[in-house]
Curated annotation (Swiss-Prot):
The keyword Secreted does not apply. Highly expressed in placenta. Low expression in small intestine, liver and colon. Expressed in brain (at protein level). It is a multi-pass membrane protein. The extracellular loop 3 (ECL3) is involved in binding porphyrins and transfer them to other carriers, probably albumin. It comes from Homo sapiens. Keywords: ATP-binding, Cell membrane, Disulfide bond, Glycoprotein, Lipid transport, Membrane, Mitochondrion, Nucleotide-binding, Phosphoprotein, Translocase, Transmembrane, Transmembrane helix, Transport. Changing S572R: Decreased protein abundance; loss of localization to the plasma membrane. This is Broad substrate specificity ATP-binding cassette transporter ABCG2. Changing D620N: No effect on protein abundance; no effect on substrate transmembrane transport. It is found in: Cell membrane; Apical cell membrane; Mitochondrion membrane. ATP binds at residues 80-87, 184-190, 211, 243.
Length: 655
C-alpha cells in the first residue's frame, strides 16, 4: 500500500486553465469533458484520548480503510449510514482533511493534484455558509471579486455572475437578501443554490458537496439534485455525500460509492448496485427504495433483508461458508473485494497511474491567492460594513441603548456640585462610565465566533488571507461600533453632568472612553478568537472584568493593597480608564469654595481640592500621570490584537 501526504506540487506546465493536470494525451477535449478523480489505497486514522483526565491514553481510530475508486464526469454519490465515513472520504478527496494520519494517493487525470487544488475546485459545505444580510447577487459578487483573476474586467465578472444566476434559476431572487434569523430571506432551496453558485463562479471542473439535501424537504431536495444532474451533463465531475435519498434522486446517480465503518461495500455504476447485491444473495423487494435497501443490508436491521437472506442461505453458504461467522461489515467488504467491480476498478486505477508509484513529496498546506492583500482588505471591509448596516440588532439597537443609558445617567447625576457630594458623585459616575465601556465591549466576542465556519470555508477556498480578514473586520466592524457609542455617550453625559467646562477636558474624556472600549474589545477578541460557543467566551470575559473592577481604584484604595498583590492593578483595564478620567476631571477643581484656602481650615480632614483627592488616590498630578494611562491601554490593545490574530492564524482549519 502506498503512503504519502496527499498534497503535492507539480509544475505549472502540467496543469490546464482550471488548475487541474491534463491527461497524458494533452487532449483539449478533456477540459470540457471534466476531470477524472481517482483515489488509491486511502487510509485515514485519528488519535483520540480515552479515559479520565489523570490517566488519559491516546487511542488510534481508523476512519477509512484501504479505499479505492474512480470519480468520472457525472453524478458521483457517496452513500452510507451515519458515522460510516462518507464525509471524511469527501474531505480527503477535496484536500480538506488534516494530512496527519492520512495515507494514499489522489490523482486528477492520472497526475497528482496541484497544490492549489482547494482553490480551483468547488466545495459546498453541509451548512450553507453565505452572508445572510447580503443579497444573492452581492454574495456572488464577493466570490467573483476575490476568486477570479484581477486581469478580468468588471464587465466580464458581471457576465460570469449573471450566467451563474441564470444557470441556477435564481433570476427572481437575485436582488433579495439571503436571510438571517432576524431577516426574512430566500427559501432553503434558493439558499442552497446560492451556496452552489459561490463555487461555480470559478467554473470548476470538480465540484464537491457535503450532504446537499440536508435540511431540505423532499421536493426541494429533488430540485437541487436535478440541478446538479444538469450541471454534470455539461462535463463537470460532481462528487457528493448523501445520507438517505429518495428513489427519484437515486436514479439520477451515475456512480455509487457505498461506505460503512470506513470500509468499502460497493463502488461502481449506481444502476448496477442492485444486481451486485442480488448476486451476493440480497434481493430488494418490489417498490422498495434501493438506497434504503442498501442501508438495511449494512445495518442488518431489515425484516425483508432477513427473509431474503434466509431464502438464499443455502446458496450463500455454498459460495462462502466461512463468512457466516464474520461480522456483517467485514463480510460485505470481503464480498466486494472478491467481486468483478473491484477488479475492474483496480485495473483502471493501474492504467490511470501508469503502473508507476508516484513520487512522494511532503508539502505544507499552502493556499494560493488570485488577488492582492489590499484588494482582499477592501472587499472584506466592504462586506463587513454592509453586514453591520444590515444587522439592526447589532448596530441600531446598540446606539439606541447608548442614547437611553446616557440620558438616564445624565438625569441621575444631573448638575454635579462643587462640594463634598460632588467628589463622591464624580468618582461614582466616572467609575460607572469606565466599567460600562468594558461590559458593553463583551458583544465583541461575536465578531469572530459567529462567522467561524464562514471564515474557515472561505480561507481554505482561497478567498483571502488571514491578515486581510482580520484587519478588514477591525476597520469596518470593531472600530465604528466602539467609537460611535463613546462619542454619543460623552456628548450626552458631559454637559448634563456639568463636568469641567473646558474643550480639552471634553475631548480627553471622549478619547479615554474610546481607548477603554478598544482595549476591552481587543481583550474580548483575544479570548473569543477560535472559540465555537459565544457563551463560553462571554463567561470568561465577565469573570475577567469583575476581577479587574476590584483593582480599578474605587472599591479599594490602591495605595493600601499589600505589595505582593498590588502588581495585579497593572492588568486592570478599568483602572487605567478610571485614573485618566479622574486626572482629567479633578485637577484644578475646588470643592470648598466658601473656605479661605490660605487661612486656617477648621475641617482639616476634608478634601477641598481636586489635587488633594488625587494625591489620596495615589495618582500622579503631572501630565504624564494622565497620558501614561493611554499609553498602557494602547499597549494592551496591541498585545490583545496580536494574540487574537495569532489564534486565528493557527486555528485548526482542517477537520
Amino acid at each position: 500500500m502506498s503512503s504519502s501526504n496527499v498534497e503535492v506540487f507539480i509544475p505549472v506546465s502540467q496543469g490546464n486553465t482550471n488548475g487541474f493536470p491534463a491527461t497524458a494525451s494533452n487532449d483539449l477535449k478533456a477540459f470540457t469533458e471534466g476531470a477524472v478523480l481517482s483515489f488509491h489505497n486511502i487510509c485515514y486514522r485519528v488519535k483520540l484520548k480515552s479515559g479520565f483526565l489523570p490517566c488519559r491514553k491516546p487511542v488510534e481510530k481508523e476512519i477509512l480503510s484501504n479505499i479505492n475508486g474512480i470519480m468520472k464526469p457525472g453524478l458521483n454519490a457517496i452513500l452510507g449510514p451515519t458515522g460510516g465515513g462518507k464525509s471524511s472520504l469527501l474531505d480527503v478527496l477535496a484536500a480538506r482533511k488534516d494530512p496527519s494520519g492520512l495515507s494514499g494517493d489522489v490523482l486528477i487525470n492520472g497526475a497528482p493534484r496541484p497544490a492549489n487544488f482547494k482553490c480551483n475546485s468547488g466545495y459546498v459545505v453541509q451548512d450553507d455558509v453565505v452572508m445572510g444580510t447580503l443579497t444573492v447577487r452581492e454574495n456572488l459578487q464577493f466570490s467573483a471579486a476575490l476568486r477570479l483573476a484581477t486581469t478580468m474586467t468588471n464587465h466580464e465578472k458581471n457576465e460570469r455572475i449573471n450566467r451563474v444566476i441564470q444557470e441556477l434559476g435564481l433570476d427572481k431572487v437575485a436582488d433579495s437578501k439571503v436571510g438571517t434569523q432576524f431577516i426574512r430571506g430566500v427559501s432553503g432551496g434558493e439558499r442552497k443554490r446560492t451556496s452552489i453558485g459561490m463555487e461555480l463562479i470559478t467554473d470548476p471542473s470538480i465540484l464537491f458537496l457535503d450532504e446537499p439535501t440536508t435540511g431540505l424537504d423532499s421536493s426541494t431536495a429533488n430540485a437541487v439534485l436535478l440541478l446538479l444532474k444538469r450541471m454534470s451533463k455539461q462535463g463537470r465531475t460532481i462528487i457528493f455525500s448523501i445520507h438517505q435519498p429518495r428513489y427519484s434522486i437515486f436514479k439520477l446517480f451515475d456512480s455509487l460509492t457505498l461506505l460503512a465503518s470506513g470500509r468499502l461495500m460497493f463502488h461502481g455504476p449506481a444502476q448496477e448496485a442492485l444486481g451486485y447485491f442480488e448476486s451476493a444473495g440480497y434481493h430488494c423487494e418490489a417498490y422498495n427504495n434501493p438506497a434504503d435497501f442498501f442501508l438495511d443490508i449494512i445495518n442488518g436491521d431489515s425484516t425483508a433483508v432477513a427473509l431474503n437472506r434466509e431464502e438464499d442461505f443455502k446458496a450463500t453458504e455454498i459460495i462462502e461458508p466461512s463468512k457466516q461467522d464474520k461480522p456483517l461489515i467485514e463480510k460485505l467488504a470481503e464480498i466486494y473485494v472478491n467481486s468483478s467491480f473491484y477488479k475492474e476498478t483496480k485495473a483502471e486505477l493501474h492504467q490511470l497511474s501508469g503502473g508507476e508509484k508516484k513520487k512522494k513529496i511532503t508539502v505544507f498546506k499552502e493556499i494560493s491567492y488570485t488577488t492582492s492583500f489590499c484588494h482582499q482588505l477592501r472587499w472584506v471591509s466592504k462586506r463587513s460594513f454592509k453586514n453591520l448596516l444590515g444587522n439592526p440588532q447589532a448596530s441600531i439597537a446598540q446606539i439606541i441603548v447608548t442614547v437611553v443609558l446616557g440620558l438616564v445617567i445624565g438625569a441621575i447625576y444631573f448638575g454635579l456640585k462643587n462640594d463634598s457630594t460632588g467628589i463622591q458623585n464624580r468618582a461614582g459616575v466616572l467609575f460607572f462610565l469606565t466599567t460600562n465601556q468594558c461590559f458593553s465591549s463583551v458583544s465583541a466576542v461575536e465578531l469572530f465566533v459567529v462567522e467561524k465556519k464562514l471564515f474557515i470555508h472561505e480561507y481554505i477556498s482561497g478567498y483571502y488571507r488571514v491578515s486581510s480578514y482580520f484587519l478588514g473586520k477591525l476597520l469596518s466592524d470593531l472600530l465604528p461600533m466602539r467609537m460611535l457609542p463613546s462619542i454619543i455617550f460623552t456628548c450626552i453625559v458631559y454637559f448634563m453632568l456639568g463636568l469641567k467646562p473646558k474643550a480639552d477636558a471634553f475631548f480627553v474624556m471622549m478619547f479615554t472612553l474610546m481607548m477603554v472600549a478598544y482595549s476591552a474589545s481587543s481583550m474580548a477578541l483575544a479570548i473569543a478568537a477560535g472559540q465555537s460557543v459565544v457563551s463560553v467566551a462571554t463567561l470568561l470575559m465577565t469573570i475577567c472584568f469583575v476581577f479587574m473592577m476590584i483593582f480599578s481604584g474605587l472599591l479599594v484604595n490602591l495605595t493600601t493593597i499589600a505589595s505582593w498583590l498590588s502588581w495585579l492593578q497593572y492588568f486592570s483595564i478599568p483602572r487605567y480608564g478610571f485614573t485618566a478620567l479622574q486626572h482629567n476631571e479633578f485637577l484644578g477643581q475646588n470643592f470648598c469654595p466658601g473656605l479661605n484656602a490660605t487661612g486656617n481650615n477648621p475641617c482639616n480632614y476634608a478634601t477641598c481640592t481636586g489635587e488633594e483627592y488625587l494625591v489620596k488616590q495615589g495618582i500622579d498630578l503631572s501630565p504624564w500621570g494622565l497620558w501614561k494611562n493611554h499609553v498602557a491601554l494602547a499597549c494592551m490593545i496591541v498585545i490583545f490584537l496580536t494574540i487574537a490574530y495569532l489564534k486565528l492564524l493557527f486555528l485548526k482549519k482542517y477537520s
